[in-house]
Amino acid sequence: MNIIPCSIKTLKGLYDISGVEVGQHFYWQIGGFQIHAQVLITSWVVITILLGSVLIAVRNPQTIPTDGQNFFEYILEFIRDLSKTQIGEEYGPWVPFIGTMFLFIFVSNWSGALLPWKIIELPHGELAAPTNDINTTVALALLTSAAYFYAGLSKKGLSYFEKYIKPTPILLPINILEDFTKPLSLSFRLFGNILADELVVVVLVSLVPLVVPIPVMFLGLFTSGIQALIFATLAAAYIGESMEGHH
């Protein structure tokens, strides 16, 4: 069986995805590298929103939480429950990772509909939600894969790789490919949904600029939240699966 060549081709294909371009892009030239400025700018805005919200909400922590502190404690409890359900009793160390993934994707998705990115003019292209770019979604998916392998190896050591020949060695190629197709499915699902949502809204606004786009925008906010939840749930499930060693 051509297992190694097939795996190399899959990895190369995943790497090449980061070079896919949709529309025009604005780049910064730093040394000999071209930096995708649009994604960095919008990602920094999202990170600033998240950090700023947390700092404001918990600047004066109370024993009995109120207002913003109560809201963020509810979010933390939700993420902990999600992690515990998917990972199991050893979920604790993974709560920050799952929470970061969920919150970054959630705020990124919503920023595409709620923030006026389009009014900011760039020499080339335009600003949009970070998750509207395949580079961002591939990076998030690769981080999930790295966490997936780290969880399995830290729990079981080299015996982790025994799972590839279970329940029978015949499934070795399929089990190997499964680990490389997971980031592909994660990245394309998130990228496709967010890109399609923004394109639909842009088209409807250009055709019927007043009433019709509003319900679509609310639907987009709902589906954007669902996509963040799906990504975080699958990431936690993959980590739990690697630690338990079953499919």
From Swiss-Prot:
A Gene Ontology term for the protein's cellular component: proton-transporting ATP synthase complex
Membrane topology term: Multi-pass membrane protein
Main location: plastid
Gene3D superfamilies named in the record: ATP synthase, F0 complex, subunit A (1.20.120.220)
Compartments, as annotated in UniProt: Plastid, Chloroplast thylakoid membrane
Keyword tRNA processing annotated: no
Pfam families assigned: ATP-synt_A
One GO MF term attached to the UniProt entry: proton-transporting ATP synthase activity, rotational mechanism
Domain of life of the source: Eukaryota
Entry's family note: Belongs to the ATPase A chain family.
Protein name, entry field: ATP synthase subunit a, chloroplastic
